[in-house]
Structures are given as C-alpha cells and as structure tokens.
Regions:
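Internal acidic/polar
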Residues: 2-5, 9-10, 99-131, 162
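Short, Lys/Arg-enriched C-terminal cap helix and immediately downstream tail that follows
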Residues: 94-97, 150, 185-199
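Sigma70-family region 2
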Residues: 21-22, 48-49, 61-76, 95-97
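Short, charged helix-capping/linker segments at alpha-helix termini
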Residues: 3-4, 21-30, 40-59, 174, ...
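Arg/Lys-rich amphipathic alpha helix in sigma70-family domain 2
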Residues: 66-73, 83-104, 131
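Residues in the helix-turn-helix
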Residues: 52, 176, 183, 187
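Helix-turn-helix DNA-binding module
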Residues: 139-176
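Amphipathic, Lys/Arg- and hydrophobic-enriched alpha-helical face
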Residues: 32-50, 67, 142, 187, ...
Length: 199
C-alpha cells in the first residue's frame, strides 16, 4: 500500500520525490509545476541558447522520472535537479560547439533565439535607464566569463547554493567552486572597473 502524496499541507520536493519513488507518478506534476521556470532560468544563465531551453528543460524532467530511483531520499532536491539539467545543457553546448552551430549571433539580442533584456529606453525615468544599463553591463560581463567560472557565479550567487551543492552540480570539489568563484569575481571586478572608468 502506498501512502498518499499529500498528507497535510503542501508536500516538500523531497516528499514528492519519495512518493515518486514509491510508484506515485502523480507526484511528478507538482515538481514540474514548481521547477519548470527555475530550470529554464538556470539553463539560460549557463549560456544555453533560448531556442534550446524548452527542449532541455523537458528532457530534464524526463530524466528526473527515469532516474528517480537514484535520488537519495532526504537529500536536497534542488542541487540534484539542477545537476540533471546542467549536464543536459552542457552536453547541448558541447554538441553545438562541435557542430560549429554556436555563433555570436546566438548571443545577439537582435537575433531570434538570442537573449532578450528589458529595453532601457522604455524606462520612464533616467535613473531607471541608468540602472538598466548597469544591469545589462553586469549581465554581459557575467556572460563573457569562461563557462566554468560563469557556472560558479550562477550556482552560488544567483541560485544561492552552498559551495557543496554547487560542487555537486558542477562535478567538482567545493574548494574548486570557491577557487572558480574567486577568479570570476576578480575578472568581474576588473571588467566593472574598466566600465566605470569610461563613464
């Protein structure tokens, strides 16, 4: 006999995974609903072209279902899911690179499938426009980082994961995450100093 998914209140991700492991396939739907946007945002922040994000996110949830038995009940769910999604995203990026399909145009906001940010000219006040320009500059600086450094910034600074959780996702040690984050911050500091010196 299986236990019901929802006993009282809203089940945690970990409880839903335990239910999914116990044969309750209905536990997958709330996980997808909760995490679909977060997975897509994570993939975009890793540099996956927006044209590929939907497919990879769907594949991540298919893998979640297929690999549900490998999830250790009681372990943090977020790093486990982002590891699945990140691996799929990195595989797609490697595939694109090998096929020479990845180009500067994919990063160009004027091209379909590129990154799209808020138009700073659409802001009503000059201070909002300045903030939008600053945010765009920082975003561009982060995107210009080497992939392993950018991934450390995304995991620790944007996703607010611990070094250990980030290490699990990135497939390295917590010390390596710390080192990559240090190097990324150094590069970002230099880039931002150059930006502000121009103004």
């Amino acid at each position: 006999m299986t236990t019901p998914i929802i006993e009282t209140g809203t089940p945690t991700d970990e409880e839903l995974m335990a239910a999914l492991q116990g044969g309750q396939d209905a536990a997958l739907a709330p996980l997808i609903e909760r995490w679909e946007l977060g997975v897509k945002a994570f993939l975009l922040s890793l540099g996956v072209p927006s044209a590929d994000v939907e497919d990879i996110a769907q594949e991540a949830f298919v893998r979640l279902y297929e690999k549900r038995a490998s999830y250790r009940v009681g372990a943090a769910f977020k790093p486990w899911l982002l590891t699945l999604a990140g691996n799929l995203g990195r595989n797609r990026l490697r595939w694109r690179f090998r096929r020479r399909e990845d180009s500067i145009q994919a990063m160009d906001a004027s091209q379909p499938g590129g990154f799209h940010y808020a138009d700073p000219l659409a802001q009503p006040a000059s201070t909002l426009a300045e903030k939008a320009n600053l945010a765009q500059s920082v975003r561009s600086a982060v995107e210009a980082l080497p992939a392993n450094l950018r991934e450390a910034v995304v995991c620790v600074e944007l996703e607010e994961l611990s070094y250990n959780e980030a290490a699990q996702i990135m497939g390295c040690t917590a010390k390596a995450v710390e080192t990559r984050l240090y190097r990324a911050r150094q590069l970002l500091r230099t880039t931002c100093q150059k930006l502000f010196a121009k103004e």
